[in-house]
Amino acid sequence: MLTNKTMDILYKRIVNDERLSLTHFSIYMALLFLWYKNEMNNPFPMSRQHVMALSHLHSIATYHKCLTQLQLYGYIQYHPSYSYYTRSTIYLENIL
């Protein structure tokens, strides 16, 4: 279960990482919300449209760039699905 201490550690980690922009933060918070709604299971399914709506993004290119960078920086593992009928999966790194 996420405690206030865990949330504080996550927040400080993201805020103190100068490589991340507000867009990265917005996407990560959307993913954290979806992870929580999925009963905190890793990995969890997600759709681009849902994450973009939650993070208030309109550019698919920006979404993919930031998602790739979050993976490169060690915040997530992203496993894309190239099928219209199967959702991509996300694994949040070092969450608990």
Regions from the PLM with identified roles:
Residues 1-54, 72:
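Short recognition helix of helix-turn-helix/winged-helix DNA-binding domains
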Residues 36-96:
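Winged helix-turn-helix DNA-binding recognition segment
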